[in-house]
């Protein structure tokens, strides 16, 4: 889909072996990163976190936390080197949408971005700006795969078209 829109695409499957230096080079070269994952115990699977830990700690991605011993006004979390880049979190969940958005439901109306707040902060730490998150819900107990794929295609066109 993105290639059809004229974009170059690199894909990494974090459950397989990868070279952190090569992955960091991909991040440096990218205009945007899309993280696609299945929600797992209220967050991303451990393989995604492992990828973040091994790739985002490389010096070409972040140059510290942004603070300085000589400038007491420097703000924590501003040391990222990727300030011209964006990221997208795209996730699938077995929970229905109302579980995320309604106050009396499990996630207490926090929404997907509230649940994925730590991931958003990780990307902010390395300097990236968010695109709107995408979520496919109820994927096991009430799947609407074709409709979800159509929504995702329209979403990609909105963000990257």
Model-assigned labels for residue ranges:
Residues 17-25, 141-148:
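Structural motif
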Residues 10-12, 34, 88-90, 131-134:
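Hydrophobic/aromatic beta-strand patches that form the interior of the parallel beta-sheet core
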Residues 106-161:
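Glycine-rich phosphate/pyrophosphate-binding loop and the adjoining helix
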């Amino acid at each position: 889909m993105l290639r059809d829109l004229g974009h170059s695409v690199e894909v990494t499957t974090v459950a397989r072996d990868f070279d952190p230096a090569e992955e960091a080079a991909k991040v440096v070269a990218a205009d945007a990163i899309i993280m696609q994952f299945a929600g797992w115990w209220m967050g991303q699977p451990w393989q995604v976190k492992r990828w973040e830990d091994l790739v985002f700690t490389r010096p070409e991605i972040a140059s510290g936390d942004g603070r300085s011993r000589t400038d007491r006004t420097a703000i924590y979390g501003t040391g990222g080197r990727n300030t011209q880049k964006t990221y997208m979190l795209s996730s699938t969940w077995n929970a229905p949408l109302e579980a995320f958005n309604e106050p009396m439901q499990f996630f207490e109306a926090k929404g997907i971005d509230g649940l994925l707040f730590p991931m958003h902060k990780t990307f902010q730490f390395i300097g990236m700006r968010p695109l709107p998150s995408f979520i496919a819900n109820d994927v096991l107990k009430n799947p609407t795969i074709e409709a979800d794929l159509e929504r995702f295609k329209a979403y990609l066109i909105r963000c990257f078209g």
